[in-house]
């Protein structure tokens, strides 16, 4: 299937290879002069600080192009108000490569509630405001102002997930493909190493970029559809059937009588294009102009797009934008293990550029001792965009390459303590897993290999991962190898030996997993397994932890306000959390990021996982209003007194008043009118909130730390001031003991570095691939 693909490490090198390898890719004319360069062949503009590490997109792309012989410069987080910063390295000989960074710039700058963030993990000292909104567009405009004739190549996750007309959460409307708004020459989607190397060499050979219309993994702006393709029209949901056709004049149709019977007329044979002719077939999506006014049609377009993501059988896409055509080529062929080893084996310095001095870059600090062992994810979660960006087929590194990187970390990273912080990827336990049938894999259009059940053609044997873990632990100078990436527990329970290996050697007290919800309705729309699977994994986890003599805890992640979630679903989740003694410290509402299936659900209020029709469709409830989204988030933090008024009001409206009170079965305590000030009784507190103080009995678990200060003799900072009078009151700051309560806070029987279950920081997740950890791009 890939015989005609040139491996990325076998291209003839560009003449500038004679300059050798730079210690860091230059960011100024002074650095260029030190390298003996008179100009750059390619300049990469990025919204992140420049860290020469394989978890950062600009470093991988820059080092890859350098390995092809090109002179590559970096303009990191430029001042975007004028063109001057974009001219600091001079005019590139070949093209500008533009990326917003490892994250979509809008997700980076705004919360799920559209509030401006004041920090940025990809910026020195965690400083916010160093990149513009829609950075890809702004950087493209400034590059065009600086050097009008230089080609512009878009890449990175922001461009990748906005390659077609898409719903934009921040403006609450459907926007054009970013390729049109940026006025760029070509867009590369996915990780894009293969497409980028081909584009660079073809431009270097003198080919005009406007002629590069058939490169896999690219999107281009054309005046008309390319010739030689059979176009299948999917721009409408329901087409009139041929038998429903009625001629304008009924007398034009000659009726037959019994005495006059014509011989059957030979009908022309029509040959339907086979899916195996994907190389010469394209699918027309609804136009941008139609999508921005028809939310049901948008759900249909999203469904069609997701069905065409298989790199072997997926077809090119065509979408009209006014009088122009957006042409999206087939998905890129996944990198082989040899190519993955080549990319991750490039000469990275593994530290931030020296120009940042001693400034801390939080994203780098998080991943400086982590190793990415694979790419891609076949989980297909609706709220996640990893599959749309990296693909469903897992791209693996060899064990030797991974061990070599661990040794590099040991030798190069300043202050290495002997701990590898993570050995994983988008999912911790998909290394060398995949379809056992190559023919089935080449033609499969399932959105997930594990939902609604694990495909019988999927290899779930974790032996390669187990062997890798054991080899990593043997590396000299390495004391501990952790697994911090999320574990897909429905896969893990298929291999008890893997769970035992993981729990015994690679969990540092807590293990992150993502059930995301407890109710079947939301879980089905998320394409996540039911809670029975979670319970089976929890049982195995606790069993092997006990056998290893360790007290370890699961940290579950949950999403609030996901499409398809009703108030009662969130209430049931909150009751489950309380029953299991979990208190979520960090919670996030669902974040509609471009191209996700769940984003299509959010906008269209329709299920795109099933066939979409105007009359016969599955409508789903969506929490869009600010108050309802606040309620869903508040229910995940049922233990926070600030959320109690909102939860009480909702429980009363839902007819669930019996869940308000001091009984162990209640979710929140009743309001204590006697403890309120007159202003609080008038509901005239700060920001119009009903600020309150509440007393609790010993029978209400989980609220001991929120006792009223004046009533209980607490100190000014709200902490207990010693022994308290009265039955069940806290002695010395400890929580009262009661059935079903979290373990006591004295830690007497707790191993170092661990907490009782429920005291971790589970957080609801809804961000695009590549955006939970900085290693994604």
UniProtKB/Swiss-Prot annotation:
Read off the NCBIfam families from this record: SAM_YgiQ
Residues at which [4Fe-4S] cluster binds? 377, 381, 384
Q: Where is the composition biased (Basic residues)?
A: 680-698
Cofactor(s) essential for the protein: [4Fe-4S] cluster
Q: What is this protein called?
A: UPF0313 protein VP1980
Question: What are the UniProt keywords, alphabetically?
Answer: 4Fe-4S, Iron, Iron-sulfur, Metal-binding, S-adenosyl-L-methionine
Task: List the biased-composition ranges (Polar residues).
Answer: 736-747
Q: Which protein family is named in the record? A: Belongs to the UPF0313 family.
What SUPFAM superfamilies does the database record attribute to this sequence? Radical SAM enzymes
Alphabetized InterPro entries for the sequence:
Elp3/MiaA/NifB-like_rSAM, Methylthiotransferase_CS, rSAM, rSAM_horseshoe, UPF0313, UPF0313_C, UPF0313_N
Species of provenance? Vibrio parahaemolyticus serotype O3:K6 (strain RIMD 2210633)
**Compositionally biased residues, Basic and acidic residues:** 709-719
Q: Where is the Radical SAM core domain?
A: 363-642
What's the domain of life for this entry?
Bacteria
Question: Where in the sequence does UniProt note compositional bias of the Low complexity kind?
Answer: 755-769
Q: Which GO terms of the molecular function aspect are on file?
A: 4 iron, 4 sulfur cluster binding; catalytic activity; iron ion binding
* Cofactor binding annotation: Binds 1 [4Fe-4S] cluster. The cluster is coordinated with 3 cysteines and an exchangeable S-adenosyl-L-methionine.
């Amino acid at each position: 299937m890939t015989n005609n693909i040139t491996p990325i490490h076998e291209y003839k090198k560009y003449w500038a290879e004679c300059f050798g390898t730079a210690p860091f890719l230059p960011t100024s004319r002074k650095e260029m002069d030190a390298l003996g360069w008179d100009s750059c062949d390619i300049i990469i503009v990025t919204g992140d600080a420049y860290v020469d590490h394989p978890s950062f997109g600009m470093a991988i792309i820059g080092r890859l192009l350098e390995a092809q012989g090109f002179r590559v410069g970096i303009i990191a987080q430029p001042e975007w108000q004028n063109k001057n910063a974009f001219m600091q390295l001079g005019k590139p000989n070949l093209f500008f490569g533009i990326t917003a960074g490892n994250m979509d710039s809008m997700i980076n700058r705004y919360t799920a509630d559209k509030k401006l963030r004041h920090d940025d993990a990809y910026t020195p000292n965690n400083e916010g405001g160093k990149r513009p909104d829609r950075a890809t567009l702004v950087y493209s405009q400034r590059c065009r102002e600086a050097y009008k004739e230089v080609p512009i190549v878009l890449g990175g996750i922001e461009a990748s997930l906005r390659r077609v007309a898409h719903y934009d959460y921040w403006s609450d409307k459907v926007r054009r493909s970013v390729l049109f708004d940026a006025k760029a020459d070509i867009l590369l989607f996915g990780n894009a190493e293969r497409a980028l190397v081909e584009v660079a060499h073809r431009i270097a050979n003198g080919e005009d970029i406007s002629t590069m219309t058939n490169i896999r993994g690219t999107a281009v702006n054309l005046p008309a559809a390319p010739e030689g393709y059979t176009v299948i029209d999917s721009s409408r949901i329901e087409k009139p059937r041929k038998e429903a056709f009625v001629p304008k004049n009924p007398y034009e149709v000659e009726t037959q009588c019994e005495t006059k019977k014509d011989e059957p007329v030979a009908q022309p044979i029509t040959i339907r294009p086979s899916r195996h002719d994907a190389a010469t077939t394209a699918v027309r999506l609804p136009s941008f102009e139609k999508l921005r006014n028809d939310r049901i049609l948008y759900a249909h377009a999203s469904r069609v797009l997701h069905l065409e993501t298989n790199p072997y059988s997926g077809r090119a896409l065509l979408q009209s934008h006014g009088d122009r055509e957006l042409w999206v080529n087939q998905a890129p062929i996944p990198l082989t293990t040899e190519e993955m080893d080549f990319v991750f084996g490039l000469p990275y310095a593994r530290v931030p550029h020296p120009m940042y001095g001693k400034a801390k870059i939080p994203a780098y600090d998080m991943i400086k001792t982590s190793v990415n062992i694979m790419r891609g994810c076949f989980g297909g979660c609706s709220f996640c965009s990893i599959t749309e960006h990296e693909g469903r087929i897992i791209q693996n590194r060899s064990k030797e390459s991974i061990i070599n990187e661990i040794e590099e970390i040991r030798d190069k990273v300043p202050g290495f303590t002997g701990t590898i912080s993570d050995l994983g990827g988008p999912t911790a336990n998909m290394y060398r897993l995949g379809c056992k049938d190559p023919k089935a894999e080449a033609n499969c259009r399932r959105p997930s290999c594990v939902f609604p059940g694990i495909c019988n053609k999927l290899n779930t044997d974790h032996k390669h991962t187990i062997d890798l873990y054991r080899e990593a632990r043997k590396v000299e100078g390495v004391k501990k190898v952790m697994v911090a990436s999320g574990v897909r527990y429905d896969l893990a329970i298929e291999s008890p030996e893997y769970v035992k290996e993981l729990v015994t050697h690679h969990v540092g007290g807590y293990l992150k997993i993502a059930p995301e919800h407890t109710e079947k309705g939301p879980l089905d729309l998320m394409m996540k397994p039911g809670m029975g699977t979670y319970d089976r994994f929890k049982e195995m986890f606790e069993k092997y932890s006990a056998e290893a003599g360790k007290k370890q805890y699961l940290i579950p992640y949950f999403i609030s306000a996901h499409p398809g979630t009703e108030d009662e679903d969130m209430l049931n989740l909150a009751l489950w959390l309380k029953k299991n003694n979990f208190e979520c410290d960090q919670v996030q509402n669902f974040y509609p990021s471009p191209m996700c299936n769940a984003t299509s659900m959010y906008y269209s209020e329709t299920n795109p996982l099933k066939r979409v029709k105007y009359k016969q469709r599955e409508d789903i409830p969506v929490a869009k209003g600010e108050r309802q989204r606040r309620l869903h988030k508040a229910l995940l933090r049922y233990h926070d007194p600030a959320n109690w008024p909102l939860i009480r009001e909702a429980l009363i409206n839902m007819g669930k008043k019996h869940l308000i009170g001091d009984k162990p079965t209640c979710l929140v305590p009743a309001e204590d009118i006697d403890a309120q000030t007159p202003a609080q009784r008038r509901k005239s507190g700060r920001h119009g909130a009903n600020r309150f103080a509440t007393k609790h009995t010993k029978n209400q678990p989980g609220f001991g730390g929120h006792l009223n200060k004046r009533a209980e003799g607490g100190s000014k900072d709200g902490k207990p001031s010693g022994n308290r009078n009265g039955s069940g009151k806290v002695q010395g700051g400890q929580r009262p003991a009661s059935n079903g309560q979290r373990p006591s806070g004295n830690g007497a029987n707790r191993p170092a570095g661990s907490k009782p279950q429920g005291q971790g920081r589970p957080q609801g997740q809804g961000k695009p691939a590549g955006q939970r950890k900085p290693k994604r791009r």
